Amino acid sequence: MAVQEIKKRVEKNRGNIIQFLCEICAIPSLEGQLKEVGNRIGAEMTKLGFDEVRFDKMGNILGRIGSGKRVIVYDSHIDTVGVGDPATWGWDPFKGKVENGILYARGAVDEKGSTPGMVYGLSFAKELGLLEDTTAWYFGNMEEWCDGIAPNAFVEVDPGIRPDFVVIGEPTKMQLYRGHKGRIELKITATGRSAHAASHYLGDNAVYKMMAIITQVRELDRRMRFGMGYHPVQGYPSIAVTDVSARTASLNAVPDQFTIYLDRRITLSETRDEVIAQIKGLIPDYLQDEIHVEELYYDKPSYTGFVFPVSKFYPPWLLDDAHPLTQAGQCTIEALWGGKRALGTWDFSTNGTYWAGKAGIPSIGFGPGNEDFAHTNLEQVPLDEVVSAAEFYALFPKMLSEQVK
């Protein structure tokens, strides 16, 4: 009965759901600037009868329905990366275009595409009485520049609530995902001595010192591709140099400092301490005093001025296939569309790195679209999936209550 009623409501609101997505994609939300898009989402939640709608101290938008003992969070980050050169898009990156039932726009799949389904789905669940003994939160947050910082503040600061379960709306191709690799961001700095390039031999070129490290980083990544750190579900770890910078007096001077930045992807087969020790082990003994490894921290203020310093270590996580949350997700899919679907994991990182990785809160992922299109100038999401996702988000709380009575 609930399934059919949900489907009726979703189909009746198909146009509203699609229009809502188009409108929030058309509002740029770069660099964590969420106020305008948050206001638009908040207005929709108010219209649909959410019990509480407000911004938190960081500037994320919150919507609550119910006040039961079981607390569920639907997590959808609503900030986006930039668009690069707009001329490479062929259409307005934010207003986008709809072609063959697909919306092409920045944020369409990463990750504004899950927001309409979550917001409408929860409102339908409320109308149909499917949230008995449940408090359900929609959490539209900033994530692109520091995975997990928003949920960390959600638990520890505002609203200061530790949920029992989390559903992450990152794209999963309408399958159930339950984890991903972790990562750590590191900075390696080599110091030298400046000199005029005409007499460079009087200096000590910091770039040359780093060359051996860069070569070893590339070799380390190659060894990982051959099985080092492999995990049977999460796959292979990796490492890459992602940025460099030099400090030099001028273009005709020897640099006295050279810095590289590393992105190290981590599986559950590895530990944080092992990974850091591994990187430090790349430094030759004779350069131990001249090359230093530093773990990065994020301490930039949000658009509201809120500062929440965190390490840029993002743990890997994986929820067991037999966990009641996983089973509730699979049962929801089966009830709605017949048959369970293959479980998966993301290649990229999500807010699950805090929810599940740091806080140990059971989490799963379900969302429309394919992550392969994230951060590209072909970013896209099938509108049929955006609409159908609302069915999942509406029914899921009821199916979860049957798994964790």
Where do the language-model regions lie?
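Residue-level signal for inorganic ion chemistry
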Residues: 24, 28, 170, 210, ...
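Short, flexible, mixed-charge acidic loops at enzyme active sites
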Residues: 84-96, 181-185, 304-309
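A short glycine/serine-rich beta->alpha loop
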Residues: 100-109, 195-197, 342
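A structural signal for isolated positions on well-ordered beta-strands in alpha/beta enzyme cores
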Residues: 54, 73, 137-139, 292
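Acidic/His- and Gly-rich active-site-bordering loop/insert found
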Residues: 2-104, 127-132, 370
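Metal-dependent amide/peptide-bond hydrolase catalytic core
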Residues: 3-5, 187-405
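Acidic/histidine-rich catalytic neighborhood of metal-dependent amide-processing enzymes
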Residues: 111-181, 185, 401, 405
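Buried hydrophobic packing segments
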Residues: 41, 115-125, 151-154, 210-213, ...
